[in-house]
């Protein structure tokens, strides 16, 4: 069954366009009913990033949850992985993160976590959607059974201690100068504080949110500012988080980008040497570079690919028994520690390797030579451009052009109206020609 509201990562769209107070109210009521358990008072934790619209959506969701008898614990601005962790730690029935992750400030979204801290399955999301479209007046709580809402103090300290416990107790970051870009988002308080507690010399940028500057020319979607700051401050490493801190990219001391594939290579090789891999391999998506696959094969490690989306990576990790997976965009999942992507915890694992080896980050974190990879986006307003016969014919012609010396991936984004066209192969010019053929056909189809 096609889903009406939920995409690959919750519900997401323009605030007061797609994500309205009415929608948030319905999500709160429907999810509250789905996650009621027995007769005791049910609890939901709600976190958010720093978007201006977060206040509006949070208030509407509180109304929805309390109207069906659920108590609400408000966490305030806090990373998405912290919400997942606290949902489980605080024995809540449900967790909510109000965020549009790496999207511009005008967008917002709603992510839901079950009592174990994992994102909801497609089946549960469909149950919630069905209730959202039903008249549930008769299922609202009686006046004496309405829920209560209150703000919870100390949640930042809980997450900081959780993150620090993922490192060996004796490990210190003393001697490391770290620039961290918090994207003016949910991590602006907790991550600089945690790095300082671990002994690092911390320089924070993107840590002055005003409700409208989240992800604006900063964070993991715009790492140039971080690269400049790392060089300016002669830092050892830079950490770039996104708006809700569930993904991370890094910068070496020379100002060069370290993407999610390279981070996975660093962690996988280190964990293999330490005997910490549950199975000899990792899980990635179809977007991961073939260079990573070749590197892992040289280490005797396999690489399982999934569709794009950290939820699909996690599903395969759980199904096949892997404890490390991720995406080139910087979603890194380490199931020994977390139930979802955690940008900061992933960064800590890399910092631990850097400290252990005592070598420059540029030597530690570039483990393989990536194959040339071209990624272009085509935005559309409506319809299904990929079903256009001319587009399909052009994709087939582009694949013939590569002649088995590379690969093409053309897909619709699950979070915004964009077609992503990715090409990869040993011959960059041939790959770019193939990608441009498809982009041109899509652009004509969109205009038509």
Curated annotation (Swiss-Prot):
**Names of the cofactor(s):** Mg(2+)
Q: Which residues bind Mg(2+)?
A: 101, 242, 244, 246
| Broad enzyme group | isomerase
**Which InterPro entries does the record cross-reference, listed alphabetically?**
A-D-PHexomutase_a/b/a-I, A-D-PHexomutase_a/b/a-I/II/III, A-D-PHexomutase_a/b/a-II, A-D-PHexomutase_a/b/a-III, A-D-PHexomutase_C, A-D-PHexomutase_C_sf, A-D-PHexomutase_CS, Alpha-D-phosphohexomutase_SF
- Output the superkingdom of the source species: Bacteria
Q: How is the cofactor bound?
A: Binds 1 Mg(2+) ion per subunit.
What reaction is this protein's catalytic activity? alpha-D-glucosamine 1-phosphate = D-glucosamine 6-phosphate
> Which residue positions are annotated as catalytic?
101 (phosphoserine intermediate)
Pfam families from the UniProt entry: PGM_PMM_I, PGM_PMM_II, PGM_PMM_III, PGM_PMM_IV
Query: What GO terms fall under cellular component here?
Result: cytosol
Q: What post-translational modification information does the record give?
A: Activated by phosphorylation.
Respond yes or no to whether keyword Membrane is given for this record.
no
What EC number is given for this enzyme? 5.4.2.10
Q: Which HAMAP family match?
A: GlmM_B
UniProt-listed NCBIfam families: glmM (TIGR01455), PRK10887.1 (NF008139)
Function statement: Catalyzes the conversion of glucosamine-6-phosphate to glucosamine-1-phosphate.
Q: What is this protein called?
A: Phosphoglucosamine mutase
Question: What species does this protein belong to?
Answer: Afipia carboxidovorans (strain ATCC 49405 / DSM 1227 / KCTC 32145 / OM5) (Oligotropha carboxidovorans)
């Amino acid at each position: 069954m096609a889903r009406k509201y939920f995409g690959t990562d919750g519900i997401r769209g323009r605030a007061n366009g797609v994500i309205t107070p009415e929608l948030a109210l319905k999500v709160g009521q429907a999810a509250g009913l789905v996650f009621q358990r027995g007769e005791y008072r049910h609890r939901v934790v709600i976190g958010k990033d720093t978007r201006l619209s977060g206040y509006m959506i949070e208030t509407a969701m509180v109304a929805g949850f309390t109207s069906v008898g659920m108590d609400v614990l408000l966490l305030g601005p806090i990373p998405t992985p912290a919400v997942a962790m606290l949902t489980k730690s605080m024995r809540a029935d449900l967790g909510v993160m109000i965020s549009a992750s790496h999207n511009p400030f005008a967008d917002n979204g709603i992510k839901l976590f079950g009592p174990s801290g994992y994102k909801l399955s497609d089946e549960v999301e469909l149950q919630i959607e069905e209730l959202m479209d039903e008249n549930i007046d008769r299922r609202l709580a009686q006046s004496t059974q309405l829920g209560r809402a209150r703000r919870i103090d100390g949640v930042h300290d809980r997450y900081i201690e959780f993150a620090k416990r993922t490192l060996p107790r004796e490990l210190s970051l003393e001697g490391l100068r770290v620039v961290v870009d918090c994207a003016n988002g949910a991590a602006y308080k907790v991550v600089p504080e945690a790095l300082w507690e671990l002994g690092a010399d911390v320089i924070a940028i993107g840590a002055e949110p005003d409700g409208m500057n989240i992800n604006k020319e900063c964070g993991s979607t715009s790492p140039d500012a971080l690269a400049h700051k790392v060089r300016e401050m002669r830092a050892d490493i830079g950490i770039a988080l996104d708006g809700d801190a569930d993904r991370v990219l890094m910068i070496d001391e020379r100002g060069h980008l370290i993407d999610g594939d390279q981070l996975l290579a660093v962690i996988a090789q280190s964990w293999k040497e330490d005997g910490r891999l549950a199975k000899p391999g990792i899980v990635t998506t179809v977007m991961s570079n073939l260079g990573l696959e070749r590197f892992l094969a040289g280490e005797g490690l396999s690489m399982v690919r999934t569709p794009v989306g950290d939820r699909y990576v996690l599903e395969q990790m759980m199904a096949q028994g892997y404890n490390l997976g991720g995406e080139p965009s910087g979603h890194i999942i380490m199931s020994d520690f977390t139930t979802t992507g955690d940008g900061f915890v992933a960064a800590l694992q890399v910092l631990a390797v850097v400290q252990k080896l005592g070598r420059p980050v540029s030597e530690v974190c570039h483990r393989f030579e990536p194959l040339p990879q071209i990624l272009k986006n085509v935005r559309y307003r409506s319809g299904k451009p990929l079903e256009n016969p001319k587009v399909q014919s052009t994709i087939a012609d582009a694949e013939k052009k590569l002649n088995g010396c590379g690969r093409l991936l053309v897909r619709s984004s699950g979070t915004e109206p964009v077609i992503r066209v990715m090409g990869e192969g040993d011959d960059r010019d041939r790959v770019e020609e193939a990608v441009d053929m498809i982009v041109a056909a899509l652009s004509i189809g969109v205009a038509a």
